[in-house]
């Protein structure tokens, strides 16, 4: 694989990561909307199921944030390597 091919592959990967970020951000937005509705609905509920649902939503929100951080780190790493290639 030539340097040019590596650069092209890195550029394509960066574009795919942008698409992935957009998708995950959309999922996060939908999740936040659903979480607000769920939390409002379960506001006064002390049932175990309600607490499990609250924890599950909080975990899902954390996972979305983690996925976005991983995408950012991957893109930054690829960009750094691309710059190092010249």
Stretch-by-stretch model annotation:
Residues 1-86:
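Amphipathic alpha-helical hairpins/coiled-coils and adjacent low-complexity
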